[in-house]
Amino acid sequence: MTPTTNNPEVSNVAIAPNAKRLLWAGFFAILAAGVGAAIRGGILDNWGREFGFTGSQLGVITGAGFSGFCFGIIIGGVICDKIGYGKLVVAAFALHALSAFITFAPSSAMAQSTVYNYLFWGTFLFAVANGTLEAVANPLVATLFPNNRTHFLNILHASWPAGLVIGSVLGWVLDDKLQWNWKIQLALFLIPTVGYGIMFFGQHFPKSEASQKGLSLGEMFKDVGMLGALVVCVLLAIFLSGIIAPLIGKPEAVRTLGYTIGGVLLIAVGIMTRFSMGSILLFVLFVAHLLVGAVELGTDGWIQNITGNLFTSEQGKWLFIWTSAIMFSLRFCANFIEKKLGFSPVGILVTCAILACVGLNLASRISSLAVAFMALAVYAVGKTFFWPTMLAVASDRFPRTGAIAISMMGGIGMLSAGIIGAPGLGYAKDRFAGETLQKENPAVFAEYKAPSPSHFLFFAPATGFDGKKIGEVQQKVQTIRADLARTGVTDPQAALQKLTPEERAAFDAGIKGDRKTLVADSFIPATMALIYLCLLIYFKAIGGYRPVHIVPVAEQPQPAATVG
């Protein structure tokens, strides 16, 4: 595998006559995932009220959306080149349909435990279907458009923010305004599901370069090697420990079991690849994408947390729609940025990391709605190109891996969001908010502190707020704001004047905790910027960024070490 001797001109020419149809079929597939995820997030409160779930139970159901996706995309990516794209599409469509039947089964007459199982497994299967579709769509589009992967993968992934916008608007109108039953709302994701099923039906799917060359699974894994597998196995070990721990109740034993499973998987990859260390470049890309998952998927909830506390709930929804709409629009512009402005994919990533860092720092200083729109616009531009452009770089540089590398990369990003991004930011919020209130008003902190400390990886335990107590204060603020709005008072800060001194102290400390959390979070894209800058220097040193293509081994030069 060698770089092409001349940097090919960016071209939209596809390798198959039905390429555009397959592209838009993949678009609808990920759109279905976005619509379903947005609506599902909006009806969690409905499930809590109707079935009496605790916040912890709802959190576990939501977490099934991360775990299911990871299993779908990693397993799908490993077998994709061997069984073909078509069979995986059929499997994903069947899983989407099955998830709907399971999720719609609960009724108020059932026992809570029965309803919980239905919703958990319905969410899990929905996520497995989403992951399976990404295991198809990412390598399929990369194969169809080999000379402009960055552009077309960005178009493909524009469907995710589009789905979030559509799902959020539908949820706002049908739930908040019209009070429709949650089952009717959730059923709407079946519309784009039927759409991608129709568009994929009867289509011929091309084979990847690796599949065309007849590479074995072991050969496809060689660039991943022990280094790349180590990233995945460590994340899987942490994830499995977190899932099994509540069932067994023995943290040390569970942690040992999780890392044992991760170790077995790592050894299996070693045997398959004859213990090849893999590409250092791909290892670096995997680590960078771990950070992408943490900052892109893990951060949004905390930005919404700040906006939801500073402004009205409706204004918070508009800000979320604003950032998603920016992402959707800009993902159609990757070709212009690469072709007209002369940015390489790695150059795009460097710029985006800097913007994301600046945007998070601006978001931490939000004081008015106008400032919020500006700050979140900068952050949205920054995070727009991370995910699809990272997939494009991995696909450009490692065609021998077929669907494996980019599917593992997607799994790494999602696992990172679920076990590092969201939990890490939650820990930071607990730590900063608790420390702030304890310093400013120890008596109020003693009243509002959580019954047990928060833990995260190797960091010291931190005591935050009791979720129920601070939640009552936040709900009170939203109720007062709604009442004031009906009298013509639209200043969100006016509601804070009606809180008791103790409530105001706790509420303000929570806001300060949110702000400090976003500042701490900005170190992630700052680290990413340094990694991407090093990659930019590396590619400059070897003559510039170029895609590579599989060539016969006899024609390949023999480098001293594998780097990329």
Walk through the language-model features, giving the residues of each:
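Low-complexity, proline/glycine-enriched hydrophobic segments characteristic of transmembrane helices
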Residues: 248, 423-522, 554-564
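Extracytoplasmic gate region of multi-pass secondary transporters
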Residues: 40-44, 226-256, 270-321, 418-429
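Helix-loop-helix hairpin linking two adjacent transmembrane segments in secondary transporters
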Residues: 156-263
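Extracytoplasmic
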Residues: 21-55, 138, 297-307, 421-422
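C-terminal ends and interior cores of transmembrane alpha-helices
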Residues: 94-112, 354-367
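Central cavity-lining transmembrane alpha-helices of secondary-active solute carriers
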Residues: 63-78, 321-334
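Glycine-rich segments within core transmembrane alpha-helices of 12-TM secondary carriers
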Residues: 148-171, 407-429
